A protein has these predicted regions:
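Non-core capping and flanking segments associated with repeat-based/extracellular domains
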Residues: 1-274
Length: 274
């Protein structure tokens, strides 16, 4: 049983029995409150597929869904708490993350992270868009909150100008030992981080023995992007292919020469630029 709603207001009655047989719920362009959306989801015990997009009025998403397998969230929110032990796929995107990058968590001495990476440790597919600057201000750099033992597909959006984001991405990748496919979107420069750190030293211990394919879209030919790809090629012995979507304004032939000259630990690794 599925339910798809858009352009609506989610406001529950005082007595709400829930949707006991609902398995798929898609909500788009809607408004609600923290309590109403939490109660709605809590009273859908069979829910396996949830998509929430373009919403307002929700600051903290509390999702308790014991049978949830696929979660897509795209909207303005400040915190998300997950209790979904069977989750296999999570796509989390928010343009609002950058606006609270320096807000600390009360009574949390570990850092600033409100994105519950620990509760995502068992999933196979993970996409994080809009969170890297946010995560890089917290504890992910020094102490990654989870080891993604089952993660096979990883989607990341990184601003390579901001070296803290790059270091955070390396930290996350280092804790995905069975990763097979990596997809990266190179985001444009927003506000450059003043505390620039070279990635040369930190990624030396990163090892991804099972990575087979990697891709990067919106590649601009920046030295930071090339350096990241160089590190990737140096720690992936099973790598077969790196696909790059060119979006740069630099001399393409010069950048291609750099890319093709990068040493590769995998003899099968090919670099394809389109």
């Amino acid at each position: 049983m599925s339910l798809r709603l858009k352009n609506c207001i989610i406001s529950l009655p005082r007595v709400f029995q829930g949707f006991k047989r609902l398995t798929v719920l898609f909500l788009k362009r809607f408004s609600s409150t923290d309590r109403d959306i939490q109660n709605l989801l809590s009273f859908c015990p069979e829910l396996t597929n949830l998509r929430l997009s373009s919403f307002e009025g929700i600051n903290c998403l509390n999702i308790q869904a014991p049978k949830l397998e696929s979660l897509h969230v795209d909207g303005d929110f400040e915190e998300i708490n997950l209790d979904a032990p069977n989750l296999h796929e999570a796509i989390l995107s928010t343009p609002k993350a950058k606006s609270y990058q320096s807000v600390s968590v009360a009574h949390d001495k570990e850092g600033y992270v409100k994105l519950p990476l620990g509760s995502l440790s068992e999933i196979k597919t993970l996409a994080i868009f809009g969170f890297m600057k946010y995560l890089s201000k917290g504890c992910v750099l020094m102490k990654p909150p989870a080891v993604f033992t089952r993660l096979e597909n990883f989607y990341l959006a990184i601003c390579f100008w901001d070296q803290r984001q790059v270091l955070t991405a390396c930290s996350l990748l280092q804790n995905a030992p069975n990763l097979k496919k990596l997809h990266i979107r190179s985001d444009p420069l927003s506000t450059r981080d003043q505390d620039q750190v070279s990635i040369q030293g930190l990624t030396l211990e990163m090892q991804m023995d099972h990575l087979i394919t990697a891709s990067m879209i919106f590649f601009k030919g920046l030295d930071y992007e090339v350096d990241f790809l160089a590190k990737l090629l140096s720690c992936t012995p099973a790598l077969e292919e790196v696909k790059i979507e060119w979006m740069g304004e630099m001399d393409r032939s010069m950048v291609l020469t750099k890319l093709l000259a990068l040493p590769r630990v995998s003899p099968r690794a090919k670099i394809i630029v389109t």
